[in-house]
UniProtKB/Swiss-Prot annotation:
Probably part of the ABC transporter complex YxeMNO that could be involved in amino-acid import. May transport S-methylcysteine. CDD domains: PBP2_YxeM (cd13709). Belongs to the bacterial solute-binding protein 3 family. A lipid is attached at residue 21 (N-palmitoyl cysteine). A lipid is attached at residue 21 (S-diacylglycerol cysteine). GO terms for biological process: amino acid transport. The lineage of its organism: Bacteria, Bacillati, Bacillota, Bacilli, Bacillales. This is Probable amino-acid-binding protein YxeM. It is a lipid-anchor. The gene is yxeM. The keyword tRNA-binding does not apply.
């Protein structure tokens, strides 16, 4: 009788363990249908909060992609330098926040096809007549967001380190610092600057042509699972380009199509 009771207890315990394993697999399958995406939530007009809701060009592009591949989105908001770290450690699947495709980043990540094109642009005070190109920045203090491709593009154009580059954790405060003379200039995406100058009404202007043009795409870790996911996203982007969604979203935010390669 005791042996029977013991057998029943063992079987019950095994069933409980198997049940738990089953639940774990179910949860994993649920997670397989979730795309973990990073953004700053402060990058107007690409990924920012409006009335407490995350929105912007990059956000809407990613939402359209997720709908095409039938996946849910889990957004994680961090400073840009922190986003790249989370992607590298596998805590994020990708980033939807104007990540430029660079040779350095391609060593670590696989990128999707580009969904936009960006130019690193200099912005100065409206009454500034001294700065017209990157050569005029020597001896000047120039703001840039830490870890951004725009900061790196500026550094690449300054091999002798004659430009004093002042880095910021976020975009917040950069334009005001230029307008109030606390820094001489600021570098960011041309489209971002056009939108921000219009939104803020600050006395600023673009100085010269963009110093670098780059593709913007979604980065993924270099492993089989993420490569499979990347290929799904590529297919979705092809469909969104073909049906006009990418162009429509671009014109909504910029009054121009930044999803096609710039001729320069």
């Amino acid at each position: 009788m005791k042996m029977k009771k013991w057998t029943v207890l063992v079987v019950a315990a095994l069933l409980a363990v198997l049940s738990a394993c089953g639940n774990g697999n179910s949860s994993s399958k649920e997670d397989d249908n979730v795309l973990h995406v990073g953004a700053t939530g402060q990058s107007y007009p690409f990924a920012y909060k409006e009335n407490g809701k995350l929105t912007g060009f990059d956000v809407e592009v990613m939402e359209a992609v997720a709908k095409k591949i039938d996946m849910k989105l889990d957004w994680k908001l961090l400073e840009f330098s922190g986003l790249m770290g989370e992607l590298q450690t596998g805590k994020l699947d990708t980033i939807s926040n104007q990540v430029a495709v660079t040779d350095e980043r391609k060593e670590t990540y696989n990128f999707t096809k580009p969904y936009a094109y960006a130019g690193t642009q200099i912005v100065v005070k409206k009454d500034n007549t001294d700065i017209k190109s990157v050569d005029d920045l020597k001896g000047k203090t120039v703001a840039a967001v830490l870890g951004s491709n725009h900061a790196k593009n500026l550094e690449s154009k300054d091999p002798d380190k004659k430009i004093n580059i002042k880095t910021y954790e976020t975009q917040e405060g950069t334009l005001k610092d230029v307008a109030y003379g606390r820094v001489d200039a600021y570098v960011n995406s041309r489209t971002v600057l056009i939108a921000q100058i219009k939104k803020t009404g600050l006395p600023l202007k673009l100085a010269g042509d963009p110093i670098v043009y780059e593709q913007v795409a979604f980065p993924f870790a270099k492993d089989d699972a993420h490569d499979k996911l990347r290929k799904k996203v590529n297919k979705a982007l092809d469909e969104l380009r073909k049906d006009g969604t990418l162009k429509k979203l671009s014109e909504k935010y910029f009054n121009e199509d930044i999803t096609v390669e710039q001729k320069h």
